[in-house]
């Protein structure tokens, strides 16, 4: 028998009558992600998705790494199926896990008997296989509390499966089951992390980025596209809509008080993101805002910036410390790109003393000096859409 991948389901098992649609979507996502590594048979049984190679040329290691990044899988392991007999299970464990068993000093066997027709109980099977392994490998001691290695045996309806400890996978919900949203993507640390966290809840994303040439460089643009590409293993295929923002920022600088520059700029960003979301039939906006992290992210300022939207604004980072955000950025592979020293439009015309407790009435009054509708229409008319090539 060939080695296979076992993908353990997370929240999907709690979905009741909708569970099957979540499983089908998850299997579709796994199929898409494993396609570059060969032909695999993908099916679901007993709260586990099986990824089984059809050809000897399949890259099982590559498929395993890809599956670890698929949302909806809580744990993952490579396993070897065998005949459902205690002798076959022992032989498989001894050969398949030979390297780990040789390296370990202590071990235990943990069995699960999903097939209740199997003649031995779970504890009996663990004791028998553990005893046989101990006899075959005398250097091993049995430690049921703190073993260096746990040998797992799963007796299912179709076969028995032997594997070592499972690894944590991406968790969350299958991508595409949580709706469709527009995510505001800057060149910083926060917005890629917020995009990842919302995608983890099953939301398919479109990205919007605001560029202000000549104040922002071509390198800043390339940085954002690279960030989007680094998100594709988690978020799937992405389109980045680049909105020209120079005219809007220059008009704000000319006609609005300096302490309101950032706030009114944010309101324009939210307007434009809302317009794009409506056009694409998205149901929410996603930002990397974090309560109190900077002066423009007070509770009052957040309320003023979202005053111009027609749909929910999702802020997954709202209660995280910066250190927590950085940790996630490192985990998903965006941190090194985020800290490249290329300025984005958020750093253009930054006020010396931004307003921290603004009001909607003030913002609307200052915006009355601007041709809000005309500025937005011209920006949207001159936008650019770039489909980011996935890294998988």
Which residue stretches match the model-derived regions?
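Active-site adenylate/phosphate-handling loop in enzymes that bind or generate adenylated species
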Residues: 131-133, 139, 166, 171-178, ...
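A short alpha-helix-loop-beta-strand transition element characteristic
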Residues: 333-341
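Conserved G/P- and acidic residue-centered "switch" motifs that form tight phosphate/ATP-binding loops
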Residues: 188
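RNA-binding accessory domains that recognize and position tRNA/RNA substrates
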Residues: 1-182, 192-238, 307, 355-360, ...
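A conserved beta-strand->alpha-helix junction
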Residues: 227-254, 344
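Structural beta-sheet core signal
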Residues: 183, 207-209, 242, 287, ...
């Amino acid at each position: 028998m060939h080695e296979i991948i076992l993908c353990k389901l997370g929240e999907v098992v709690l979905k009741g009558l909708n569970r099957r649609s979540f499983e089908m979507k998850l299997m579709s996502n796994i199929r898409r992600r494993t396609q570059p590594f060969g032909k695999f048979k993908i099916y679901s049984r007993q709260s586990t998705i099986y990824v089984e190679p059809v050809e000897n040329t399949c890259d099982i290691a590559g498929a395993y790494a890809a599956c670890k990044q698929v949302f909806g899988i809580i744990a993952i392991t490579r396993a070897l199926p065998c005949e459902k007999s205690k002798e076959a299970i022992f032989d498989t464990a001894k050969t398949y896990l030979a390297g780990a068993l040789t390296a370990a000093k202590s071990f235990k066997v943990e069995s699960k008997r999903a097939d209740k027709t199997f003649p031995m109980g779970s504890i009996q099977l663990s004791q028998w296989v553990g005893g046989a392994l101990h006899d075959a490998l005398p250097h091993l001691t049995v430690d049921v509390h703190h073993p260096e290695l746990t040998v797992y045996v799963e007796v299912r309806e179709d076969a028995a499966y032997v594997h070592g400890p499972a690894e944590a996978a991406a968790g969350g919900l299958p991508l595409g089951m949580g709706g469709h949203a527009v995510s505001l993507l800057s060149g910083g640390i926060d917005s890629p992390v917020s995009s990842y966290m919302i995608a983890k809840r099953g939301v398919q994303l479109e990205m919007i980025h605001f560029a202000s040439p000549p104040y922002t460089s071509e390198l800043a643009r390339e940085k954002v596209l690279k960030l989007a590409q680094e998100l594709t293993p988690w978020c799937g295929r992405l389109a980045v809509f680049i909105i020209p923002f120079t005219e809007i920022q220059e008009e704000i600088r000319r006609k609005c008080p300096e302490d309101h520059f950032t706030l009114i700029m944010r309101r324009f960003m939210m307007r434009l993101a809302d317009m794009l979301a409506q056009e694409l039939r998205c149901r929410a906006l996603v930002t990397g805002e974090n309560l109190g992290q900077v002066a423009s992210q007070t509770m009052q300022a957040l309320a003023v910036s979202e005053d111009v939207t027609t749909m929910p604004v999702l802020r997954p980072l709202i209660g995280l410390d910066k250190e927590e955000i950085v940790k996630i950025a490192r985990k998903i592979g965006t941190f090194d790109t985020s800290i490249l020293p290329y300025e984005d439009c958020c750093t253009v015309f930054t006020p010396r003393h931004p307003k921290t407790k603004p009001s909607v009435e003030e913002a609307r009054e200052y915006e009355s000096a601007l041709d809000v509708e005309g500025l937005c229409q011209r920006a949207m008319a001159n936008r650019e859409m770039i489909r980011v090539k996935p890294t998988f």
